[in-house]
Amino acid sequence: MTDVLLPLAIAVPIVAATLPIALGLWFDDVGWPIAAVATTAVVGIAAAIAAEVALGGQFDHAVGTYQPPIGIELVADQLSAAVLVLIAVVSLATLAFSRVAGPRGNPFYSAYLLLVGGLSGMALTGDLFNMFVFLEIVGITTYALIAADRSGASAYASLKYLVVGTVGASLYLVGVGYAFLATGTLNMVDMREQILAQAGYGDPLIQASYALIVAGLALKIALFPVHTWQPDAYQRAPDAVTAVVAALVSTTSAYALIRVTYTVFTVDFLAANDAITTAMLVVSGTSILAGSVLAAMQSDLKRMFAYSSVAQFGMIGAAIALANETALLGGIVHLIGHGLLKFGLFLGVGTLALGYGVRRIEDAASAAREAPFTAGAIALLGLGLVGIPPSVGFLGKWYIGVGAVESSMAGAGPAGIAVAAVIFVSTLFTLSYVARLIERFYFAGVGLSGGHGDDAAAGHGDDSAGGAGDDPAGVAADGGRDDDPAANDTGAAAPVAPVEGAPRPSLVPDRVPPASLAVLLVTTLVTVSLGFAGFALAEWFGPFLTEVFA
């Protein structure tokens, strides 16, 4: 009976999403408690699914009366269970921050729960068409959440993401259609068998199908050069939304790419189509370098870490394309670790903005003196992003690099060595901007401004987004530069009147909400702890890797 947990992980948040709107007709402020209860339930369900996978291995559930491959199938294995746990934990943790930072309102929490349900569905679905359905649920709710700030800048960023995301979803759907024409099935496992038995890896329909699916998911993941929606969306979204989107949305799209590549098309398809794998490696390598360089050019903290994501997902893309077991292990570890790191970093940036109005590196002078816990957590998470051992960021990069070298030594040519070199160069760029931030935290001489309120918390549900105003022109260009008009006018966040829920000035270090600080510190502790779990992670993902490389 444990297989019923799989539909529950999806149904609970989606059904709960109707309640804030329905009960909101009679009661105010019911959205947060409903969302908290629902996401807590999802955490429990995800933990139970992971425990079942640990004890008994992969299991599945057929939805409805039709059995697979005709019916809808949900599947839990080591990879999907790990991603589901990440989704559940980050979703619940984000609510603790949104309670004080916003956005607020019943419609926001309904959209948030739909997002959680869509992400859970992407992690568990066993067929390609339902992957598209859940991908669309995630996309539509993300567009709404990014625009929850109700400013012109956030609305523009949301519209930009909507256009790009729609193109990506359309390409994915066309690719699935081609695969269906070639195989006559949508079930992932059955399609893998039909490709081998009927179509073959050299079938033009199969090749076009994979190319279109990869292109569509690359838009969703935000690989260079189709990354342009991401910096604006991350910068202009409310802080709580940025944290959950950065940690989960691109992460689940990258998970979908791993799942489609290795469960449906298999490693043999990659070996038989050198042109496709070469193109993937070129795009991934370019994304690694371009994202790192553009991140190093930024002053706005959210924009800097947004470009960093372009580089980090490029590493995951390279790990997928290398078709090497060690590299794929690194890609999966980096997928989970990067999600946690970016959640913590954006949560830390939002906490600084809420407590002190800090949004740019130059405004973060001596943050360690006035906000030692917040600054320390951001510094540790930043070093994890660089890949300093023993962080989880180091583990992922190490496995990818070792796998890349193994690939070259096994006769794959110089591509693997090139990937390892690009990752090394990217690490140097990452160190440059993280070190610049840490230098401002610990060695600059001017204290924090200490502003609170609407502008300080930029985009927490009121009518401002980092002082951007209602002019979308400030975010129209994506040339790797900051486009924050307010910051250019003043150079620092001006103190404003406090709002309800904002912390009041005191002599206590880190005058920020205790809940958000606690979540930040726990996230930091988890990322550091995972850095010591290299063998445990390799053992956990071992059965999945053994299956796909058998």
What is each PLM-predicted segment?
Residues L23, F27-V30, P107-S110, L114, ...:
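Alpha-helical multi-pass transmembrane bundles of energy-transducing inner-membrane proteins
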Residues T2, G64-A82, E193-Y210, N273-T278, ...:
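Short aromatic-rich membrane-water interface segments that cap or initiate transmembrane helices
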Residues M1-V15, A76-I87, L128-T141, Q207-L219, ...:
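Structural signature of hydrophobic alpha-helical transmembrane segments
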Residues F108-G118, Y156-L173, D190-I213, D232-S250, ...:
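Interfacial and helix-entry/exit segments of alpha-helical transmembrane bundles
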Residues A9-P13, A38, I87, Y112, ...:
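Residue-level recognition of transmembrane alpha-helices
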